[in-house]
């Protein structure tokens, strides 16, 4: 069951299943299919950014992937330093909207906080690995949303 600890499994499988189970159990299961497009956006962002980063020597996908050989600063990484984690967050917001679920919104909020602290840890490792080039990158590109934070 080690695979259940992997962040993508938790986000893209366990969060929607837990939401469906919870909402069904309390009798409030409701689906707004249009919002599933937000889920699709988040999932595709995660997958495409992971492939882009890996193809450019930026390390393997996921938290347990191979360490980065080089700093990836192009493509979507020129706009946000964490597009894969952002894909997770967008997906979970999509789950909350699709199922009109406060339960899923609470999970999304908790996981967003977890990702934020995970990113801060990742940043310490990337600073140690790449030094000044990474520090310059952090000055140019926001952690989460372009132009905001």
Model-derived features: where do they sit?
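Extended, alpha-helix-rich binding/interface surfaces that flank or overlap catalytic cores
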Residues: 82
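Membrane-anchoring alpha-helices and their flanking helix-loop junctions
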Residues: 1-77, 86-149
């Amino acid at each position: 069951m080690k695979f259940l600890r992997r962040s993508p499994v938790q986000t893209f499988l366990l969060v929607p299943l837990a939401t469906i189970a919870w909402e069904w159990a309390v009798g409030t299961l409701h689906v707004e299919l249009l919002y599933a497009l937000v889920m699709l956006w988040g999932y595709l962002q995660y997958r495409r950014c992971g492939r882009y980063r890996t193809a450019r020597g930026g390390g393997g996908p996921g938290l347990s992937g191979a360490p980065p050989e080089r700093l990836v600063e192009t493509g979507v990484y020129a706009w946000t330093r964490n597009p894969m984690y952002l894909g997770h967050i967008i997906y979970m917001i999509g789950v909350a909207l699709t199922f009109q679920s406060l339960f899923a919104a609470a999970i999304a909020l908790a996981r967003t906080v977890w990702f934020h602290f995970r990113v801060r840890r990742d940043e310490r490792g990337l600073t140690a690995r790449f030094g000044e080039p990474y520090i310059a990158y952090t000055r140019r590109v926001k952690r989460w949303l372009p132009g905001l934070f």
